Amino acid sequence: MDNNPNINECIPYNCLSNPEVEVLGGERIETGYTPIDISLSLTQFLLSEFVPGAGFVLGLVDIIWEIFSVLSSDAFLVQIEQLINQRIEEFARNQAISRLEGLSNLYQIYAESFREWEADPTNPALREEMRIQFNDMNSALTTAIPLFAVQNYQVPLLSVYVTCNYIISSESVMCGQRSGFDAATINSRYNDLTRLIGNYTDHAVRWYNTGLERVWGPDSRDWIRYNQFRRELTLTVLDIVSLFPNYDSRTYPIRTVSQLTREIYTNPVLENFDGSFRGSAQGIEGSIRSPHLMDILNSITIYTDAHRGEYYWSGHQIMASPVGFSGPEFTFPLYGTMGNSAPQQRIVAQLGQGVYRTLSSTLYRRPFNIGINNQQLSVLDGTEFAYGTSSNLPSAVYRKSGTVDSLDEIPPQNNNVPPRQGFSHRLSHVSMFRSGFSNSSVSIIRAPMFSWIHRSAEFNNIIPSSQITQIPLTKSTNLGSGTSVVKGPGFTGGDILRRTSPGQISTLRVNITAPLSQRYRVRILYASTTNLQFHTSIDGRPINQGNFSATMSSGRNLQSGSLRTVGFTTPFNFSNGSSVFTLSAHVFNSGNEVYIDRIEFVPAEVTFEAEYDLERAQKAVNELFTSSNQIGLKTDVTDYHIDQVSNLVECLSDEFCLDEKKELSEKVKHAKRLSDERNLLQDPNFRGINRQLDRGWRRSTDITTQGGDDFFQENYVTLLGTLMGFPSIYIKKWWFEIKSLYPLPIRGYIEDSQDLEIYLIRYNAKHETVNVPGTVPYGRFQPQVPIGKCAHHSHHFSLDIDVGCTDLNEDLGVWVIFKIKTQDGHARLGNLEFLEEKPLVGEALARVKRAEKKWRDKREKLEWETNIVYKEAKESVDALFVNSQYDRLQADTNIAMIHAADKRVHSIREA
């Protein structure tokens, strides 16, 4: 069978008349490496290889390049166009293809630079080139993604939209700290990633549901298209979306294994089924199982009937076991009828890795001609069941093999090996749609309905020691009384459990392959309309108990933001290799809704970045204050430092520690208020420059003010040297705003500077020239600034001046000046503070008194000298005029006398 050259041809549209050439509006479109092939390959890679590290990254680069090749070839657009019968307008199509080609070219350049850097990761030039190409690629994708959500074309462009989102998410995982990006950039990208994952997910699910509703109709032909849309968009959209959360490397820092438990359905294996059965869509859909716990298909007992010499599959019974074979085998009710025209035949499904393929033979006859519907016989007269295995395990055959191949609808995930090894799904259940005369035991239609589950949903709940294991709770052995299985929201990879009253949720049989000494911690992915308490136990032994918050409002639909991952901090170990894990929900009022998607078992030795970040943030916040009651700030805590602690808190994971994050955020806001209260500057954030003549900041015209960025949360100023003067900004603090006999420091943060001069002036001038190497270049300036003897090795600066007695009559004040005196100078600074420290005492006080006396003596001498010069100048001016009104010159006044008087006036000193 595997030697057949046609077996590997995966035709995704078996409802089309010619599988080799698809015809859409007169246009010939060749099939080949289809979106389904790409998506299945991608899903396999993410499920089997998703672990941080170079191997994952390099494999991802290859897959992304293949994705771009298919995206830009129009295939993803054609796929959904055919399913929903909506052709994208030519301008929108051409625009999308053009953008995809541009992104493809950009990605090719980036991928090459990434490979070169990966081969020589210590080479700074290669790393910088890779970073440049990454930023270009990231910016282009970020800009392009909203353009693939075109109004009126959200559904046709859905696969393109989701796949591009996948690419940008994976790139954020690829390029982290080891690529040389600073912590602020990494945190910014992480925050963007976690936010965008939710946006992408909700967009994809919303428009998937919109498209699904659009293709629904009453007849069998409509159901075929409906089912194909559901199946193919599950493979190309929903499966990938369900794995988006694993990109959060702070929550999943090691290899993480997920499982897809949703089921998809091949079309009923009947001839002429897509066009002849009116009003049957609802009945066909009703033949599919409602949401249920996953079970393991053990066997199918098939019954045979005959009509006018034609033998066919008339009915069957299913034998199945719970996951992990953890309970007795159970039998489903009979599907169809128990025909006896031939001996019943039992197909054993649990050989190898289960049934991965069916090859069916259809039988179509029109033995009746009754009424306007022209009744027909449409049945199945044989099926071959092929087993997934690494060896040539013989197939099981009911009567005979056929040509209708399930792989045409659900291709393998790996086309580089035989389908029996590279298959993507296995048979999970068989139901039946039947229709016929009400007064006859012979049905017109006997249509077995094959259900398929992804191969990642393994038979046993295996928990190893070296990975995070995600187990959907639909793999439970038993449900607690009051727990039900409900349809999943589309982004969880399967159905979920629901409770509306306190009690046991479910029991889960798990098999431990690690030594029993291995310790684990449990996490739960849940949504709830109420605060509640989760309890866990193993083999009846209580393990964990914890209180958790509501995540959604009553009456709201489940969205990605409704689900939250929470965990217990206390580790535990299993006592037996095969154990029963029990989860319960308590301490909430009946009538609320609690949804549980999965349980995660995490090796206890794994240090989560989220936990480390929380501990670091808690320590940083507590160290801002002088005591645990947060009454006052420590003197050495700067305004800039508070902003950085705020960034630290902002980067905490909402899923892991939302309540702690809110509490820490309030403490940081309180610290910021205390910082503002002690700051004597009227305008520390440069919001009112040049607004008041007598107070506030004054600046020259070539100084700019910018808003917050990765370095400054609030406004900062930029000074650039020019040919036309020296840019400066200054402020004066008046006497009545300053306490006597206090040291007065000015401090702040300089992101980078060259030839920045800082002056602090009262009795005398404190002056410092500051060079601080920065990280971001200014246009023509190079990012590397040579560090000389006058360079600051810290971005923080502080100058202080001692304030003596403040005198109403003197109005001396304190001047703060920042200035650039060279053409190539520049500076970027913010978070300025003017503080009052402890009163001066002892020698410091005596030193200030001496400086103050020296300044007063000098001032008195200057005043005495100035008065003498003033009197002489006034006498010279008075002698020029005939009266004190200075409106008429003396008759003998000449130009020499006027120049002499002017010279004396200009010799007067300004006090």
Swiss-Prot record:
Taxonomy, superkingdom: Bacteria
Biological processes annotated in GO: sporulation resulting in formation of a cellular spore; symbiont-mediated killing of host cell
GO molecular function list: signaling receptor binding; toxin activity
SUPFAM superfamilies tied to this protein: delta-Endotoxin (insectocide), middle domain, delta-Endotoxin (insectocide), N-terminal domain, Galactose-binding domain-like
Keywords tagged on the record: Plasmid, Sporulation, Toxin, Virulence
InterPro entries with a match to the protein in the record: Cry_V, Galactose-bd-like_sf, Pest_crys_Cry1Aa_dom-IV, Pest_crys_dom-III, Pest_crys_dom_I, Pest_crys_N_sf, Pest_cryst_cen_dom_sf, Pest_cryst_dom_II
Function per UniProt: Promotes colloidosmotic lysis by binding to the midgut epithelial cells of both dipteran and lepidopteran larvae.
Family named by the database record: Belongs to the delta endotoxin family.
Miscellaneous field: Toxic segment of the protein is located in the N-terminus.
Protein name: Pesticidal crystal protein Cry1Af
Biological source species: Bacillus thuringiensis
